[in-house]
A protein has these predicted regions:
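Basic, polyanion-binding surface patches
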Residues: 1-189
Length: 189
């Protein structure tokens, strides 16, 4: 039996990412975002949704760029902490002992400890209500060599223990149960 609930955003799990921003080291910040995802494959575009009162909101709006840094089980404490502490009060890179790194295309820092860093340039900002959506072009992706299969050179991100968010909690992924298209594969005879 199913129950009716009030309308809400119940699409879980979501990636729990750290978004980094700032052009100058003095304004570098990172904050936790779960409202993020892919918008388009070609051209590659993604989004983050941010409350206007967040410290990083003005930094991103001013510089029109940010980096989406995927997080891992090892980064879980920092991921939570950066979501409940403000960059107005703390230098989060120092507090969490995470390393700001240089991006290839954007001026915002990436997080060296992240297995995958997605460099983004803001294309449009849409005011939606509690959050504004920053729609962005993906201008570069930096992948950690440790997550590349040495034989195929394919990215094996599941091996990095990515962190996901489910309605108030952080989790790792479970076992792989199939691959894209496996439901229609022809059986080998």
């Amino acid at each position: 039996m199913k129950q009716d609930w009030k309308p809400g955003t119940m699409i879980y799990p979501l990636p729990a990412v750290l978004v980094s921003c700032g052009k100058e080291e003095s304004e570098y910040n990172m904050f936790t975002v779960a409202w993020t995802g892919t918008i388009c494959t070609n051209p590659p575009m993604c989004y983050i949704s941010v409350r206007p009162e967040r410290h990083s909101y003005d930094i991103i709006k001013k510089n029109m760029e940010f980096v989406i840094n995927l997080t891992t089980k090892d980064m879980a404490f920092a991921t939570d902490w950066c979501g409940v502490r403000s960059g107005r009060d703390y230098h989060k890179f120092d507090e969490m002992k995470l390393t700001p790194g240089q991006c290839t295309v954007v001026s915002a820092p990436l997080i060296e400890e992240s297995p995958l860093c997605i460099e983004c340039r803001v294309k449009e900002i849409i005011s939606l209500g509690s959050h504004d959506m920053f729609i962005a072009d993906v201008v570069n992706v930096r992948a950690d060599d440790r997550n590349l299969n040495p034989e195929t050179r394919k990215l094996e991100l599941a091996e990095a223990n990515p962190l996901v968010y489910v309605h108030g909690g952080y989790y790792n992924l479970g076992e792989k149960i199939g691959k894209f298209g496996w439901s229609v594969e022809k059986k080998k005879s």
